[in-house]
Amino acid sequence: KKNQIVYMKGCDLVNDQTLESYLDQCNIDGKPGIKATFWNNPERQGEPVSSLRTTQPINVTTYGLHTFGPGVNLEKFSVKYETVLIPKESGEILLNLEGCSYFELLVNGKSMTKHRTWRTTDTRTMLQVEKGKEYKIEILYAQVENWAANLKFNLGKEFPINYSESISKLKGIDVVVFVGGISPQLEGEEMPVNIPGFKGGDRTDIE
């Protein structure tokens, strides 16, 4: 019998919830996923340099000389991500957007959150949705100044982490490797962190 490696997300950095992604309920131009359009200037002006489509959560960075997309510069570029969410059920969902430089989230043309920052900043936008209704979601991004460039986005419904269920899935497994620790996304001098267990960027407990 061959060895098998199984990954399970046991916990979040600070959140006791896990996100069930609704990206499978998103489409644009009749095709599933998110459409990204790229410009090699910060103003999204002129002809785009390229575009692509993804059905995965957005997770891009220029660290390690990676580019956001085909033919895109490492600096002074911009992106427009767009999709339409048609939820299968009514309720409250989370739009989780994290980035550095300039980024803005719009729903049906309304700005929900906007940041221009040199440090990676996490945002959580709660949205009440109705089953079958269309919600146009746009993310505008630009690398500005000499700041780093990174962006993450996912949306969906949050559920409490079920630790008992996670433990039950370990039956029959010989070795468990837990990977955890602190994160520079949360812990740094005078960082604007407003969540339990922190005072600014200083951790007050680690339970």
Task: Specify the residue positions occupied by each region the protein language model found.
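C-terminal non-catalytic regions of proteins with extracellular/luminal or membrane-system context
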Residues: 1-207
